[in-house]
Amino acid sequence: SAQQREARVIVVGNEKGGAGKSTVSMHLSVALMRMGKKVGVIDLDVRQRSLTRYLENRLRWMQSTGAKLPMPEIVRVDASTERDLDKAESEETQRFLSSVARLKKACDFIIIDGPGGDTYLSRLAHVNADTLITPLNDSFVDFDLLGDVNPQTLEVLRPSFYSEMVWSCRKKKAQTSRRPIDWIVMRNRMSPLAARNKERVGEALTNLSKRIGFRLAPGLSERVIYRELFPAGLTLLDLTEKGSNVSFTMSHVAARQEMRDLLIILQLPELVGAEIEF
C-alpha cells in the first residue's frame, strides 16, 4: 500500500513539444489504475495543458455516457508570476513540493507531465524523478535533444543540453535520496520510414545510451487512434467500455500490446510479480 512504500514519481519529460508526452502520461496513468494502483498526476506543461484537457474530456465523456472510468487525482502547478527570479523560484519550489507531498499521502504513483523547454519547474520535476521517461520521435531531428552525433560515423560527439541537465539532476538527487533516477528513452512514432534510416537512428541511440546512461524502450507507433481518443478523454485501455463509438481493430490490439511492453520495460519495482491486467 502507499503507506508502506513512498509513492514512485514518474516524470515524462522532453525539451520539445510534439513527442506525445501527454499520450504517454495518460496511458500510463490508466494502465496503473487498471492494475489497482492509486495514481496522482501533476500537469506542469503550463502552456499547453494537454494532460489537463485530456482529463477534462474524460470527465465530460463519463457525464454524458454515465460510464465509470478510473480517474487519477490531478493537481495543477502554475508558474510563478513574480518578477524577482529568486522569489519566483522559491514560490515554484513551494507549490511543486507541496503538491507532490499531498499526492504522496494518497497515491502509489505520481505521474508528472513535464513542460516543454528548460524551465525551473522542469528541473524541479527532473530532480524529483524516480523514473524519467523521455519520448522521442524516431528521427535524427529529435535525436539532437539527446546528443550531437556525427552523421557519417554515428559516433557521439557530445551530450546535448538536455542530457547534461538530466546528468546534473541525477547527481543532485543522489545526494538526497537512495533512489537513483532510472532514465528510459522511448522511440515513439516509429513511422514506416525507410528501414535504413530507422536502423541508423537505432544504432546512434544505442551508442548514446551507453555513453550517457539511459535504457531504450520501443515507444508508441504513429497511429491515428491515439489522436481519435483525445476528444473523448479515452485511452486504448478503455475501449472495452460501453458507449465508446470507436470500433476495436487489429491496430488497437497492437497498440495495447505496446503499452504492456512499455510497462514490462519500465521495471517498476512496485509492480514486481503483478499480472498486467489490461
Labelled PLM ranges:
Residues 21:
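Conserved lysine of the Walker
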Residues 57-61, 151-153, 235-237:
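Short, hinge-like loop/turn segments at secondary-structure boundaries
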Residues 24:
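Hydrophobic positions on the alpha1 helix immediately C-terminal to the Walker A/P-loop
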